[in-house]
Amino acid sequence: MQKSLITKWLCINCIMVIATIVIGGITRLTGSGLSIVEWRPVTGILPPFSFESWQSEFAKYKAFPEYNSVNYGITLSQFKFIYLLEFIHRLLGRITALIYIVPVIYFYFKDVIKNRDMLPYIIALLLFCVQGFIGWYMVKSGLLNSPYVSHFRLAFHLIIAVIIYHILFYQLIKNRCDILLIPSQTDFKLPLIFSGIAITVVYVQIFLGALVAGLDAGLIYNSFPLMDDRFIPMEIKDNFFDLKNWYDPVFIQFIHRLVGYSVFLVVVVLIICLLKIEHPKLNKIAYFLMIALFMQVSTGIITLLYSVPIIIASIHQLFAIILLSVIIWCYFLIKSF
């Protein structure tokens, strides 16, 4: 009974974290992230209701660089759209944190979660507590002289969310999945190594994807597989190792492509390793990996070719999480044996 309760709670948390990540991506893609210029963790749980309240929020927004440099002259109705997107993202983050924090404290004191199992839950709790601060730290970078948030802070904010999801999803499958019964002579060394490598490169790729979004690097070189008929674009060919390149959208897009190829190759090798084991559950994971990889690669290419359509770009981000989830599931099953 207790195990079932924990499983359902973790499942709800995983869904909520994914939803928050996707809404956060849409908020970035629509340029809505700087529409709320204050951080009020408690009093900010309700949106403006009256016309006067909306006018007050709009007046605050007009005092910051984004209005004057990017959105000068927008109407109140247009402001409401971007404001509500950012509001929903923040509200969803608060709700997700509450759904996690309150039950985990209850489960601990009621001994539903044993002391020996508490470490990952405590780490997730701490990350939930700091994530709001990190989000505001990111937003604050776009409220100073430049109307654009730091792409590094944006990537850090996303990676913390992904780490939270990783911890919760791992605990979910730990509660839900049975250990595989496979003959002892089966060699798991290669699939274990490649599942670990796959998790690492997907994390790197998600981080790079956030840098691409932060610099609007998806709006340039909208061709595939080459960048203006070149593998390495001219802008970075002669100064490839310059640290300043990490502020250059051309370089960031190139590295995102490069790591994307690495993700594809590593996951394909992992799929081959799983199919060679000839176990129904691992074979099923291999097929799930094929689907997730295909969707991730195809939506990424479409996002690039069509200059970042919001729906496709959001699906691309979603499938990055789905691909990561399947690899984590694979890693757990192999490691548990």
Curated annotation (Swiss-Prot):
Catalytic activity: Fe(II)-heme o + 2 A + H2O = Fe(II)-heme a + 2 AH2
Membrane-topology annotation of the record: Multi-pass membrane protein
GO molecular function terms noted in the UniProt entry: metal ion binding; oxidoreductase activity, acting on NAD(P)H, heme protein as acceptor
One GO BP: heme A biosynthetic process
GO terms under cellular component: plasma membrane
Keyword set, alphabetical order: Cell membrane, Heme biosynthesis, Iron, Membrane, Metal-binding, Oxidoreductase, Transmembrane, Transmembrane helix
Keyword Iron: yes
Record-annotated membrane-spanning stretches: 6-26, 87-107, 119-139, 154-174, 192-212, 258-278, 285-305, 308-328
Compartmental location: Cell membrane
Subunit field text: Interacts with CtaB.
Reported function: Catalyzes the conversion of heme O to heme A by two successive hydroxylations of the methyl group at C8. The first hydroxylation forms heme I, the second hydroxylation results in an unstable dihydroxymethyl group, which spontaneously dehydrates, resulting in the formyl group of heme A.
Family, as annotated: Belongs to the COX15/CtaA family. Type 2 subfamily.
Protein name, per record: Heme A synthase
Organism: Rickettsia rickettsii (strain Sheila Smith)
